[in-house]
């Protein structure tokens, strides 16, 4: 999964002198899956509620950026569109204000995936717009990886594990 692929890539970077904190990362993530399981268990009731609420929505919008952009596409296109034949629209936080905001209207569920990297300011800008209520849409759902603690993990490593959290 992600852990092995990321560790492999980070080790290669380490060997080239580009990720000197590799050993520290490995030490701090050795038990990360116990925390991931806990996160999943805590989120499961919300996930079930969202699934029931939006299962029959005509289409759903997913917004993400940076380290979470791959997960945004994976869930929207691969899981919902290709596997479940659900109509979705995935958009980056940076592109949201270039027309997509006009598609936000009552009855259209919107999910904003907020990460912890340099794109967070863009995510916060989208959140501010969506939660102001100017579109009349009340189906705004924000999933912020910063809300899910991983004890013993340095903040510098959260950007690496935020896709794991979202998945």
PLM-predicted stretches and their roles:
Residues 1-167:
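A SIS-like phosphosugar-recognition module
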